[in-house]
Design a protein with these regions (language model features):
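Gly/Ser-rich helix-loop-strand patches that form or flank binding pockets
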Residues: 4, 13, 107-157
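Small/aliphatic-rich secondary-structure junction motif
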Residues: 1-60, 85-87
Length: 157
């Protein structure tokens, strides 16, 4: 029995496809809790900030900017969580500001007693994999918790 399953989500359809696999785990036996995690990387729009006239500073309220991203993440996770309501599955949501999603995911898993991480992978190979990197692959290599990778092919059912 898994006591706590961590499901990192990035807002993509592929990431949400993992939810079907999590629900299947419940069919095979009881699971204590599912944690839906969104690691929010807040990128400051430097290009837009530098678009002002020469010599004029553009005011930027980082806290308001961050709050917008974090609120958007919380609303997104609440919508995803609602899909589990009829299943009788205990679900918790976490929105965490992140400099690197893979590290945030592995740190959260280690600090919070996670038994399994279920994460989607884009399935890139070759040059595309080298250029784009893979959060899922980094999680797989950095985590001391078992990781279930869900490839795109597993979503086309």
């Amino acid at each position: 029995m898994y006591k706590k399953i961590l499901v990192p989500l990035d807002g993509s359809e592929l990431a949400e496809c993992t939810l079907n696999h999590v629900k299947k785990l419940f069919q095979d036996g009881p699971v204590g809790e599912v944690v839906l995690l969104n690691a929010v990387v807040i990128e400051i729009p430097w290009r837009e900030l530098n678009a002002g006239d020469e010599g004029h500073a553009i005011r930027f309220d980082y806290n308001a900017f961050k709050k917008t991203f974090m609120d958007k993440s919380r609303k997104y996770l609440a919508r995803v969580k609602s899909r589990f309501s009829s299943e009788g599955i205990k679900v918790k949501t976490e929105t965490i500001e992140s400099n690197g999603p893979s590290q945030t995911i592995t740190d959260y898993a280690q600090k919070n007693g996670v038994d399994l991480i279920v994460i989607a992978t884009h399935g890139y190979t070759g040059m595309k994999k080298m250029m784009l990197g893979s959060i899922a692959l980094k999680v797989l290599h950095e985590s001391n918790v078992p990781v279930l990778l869900v490839r795109p092919e597993a979503c086309r059912v």
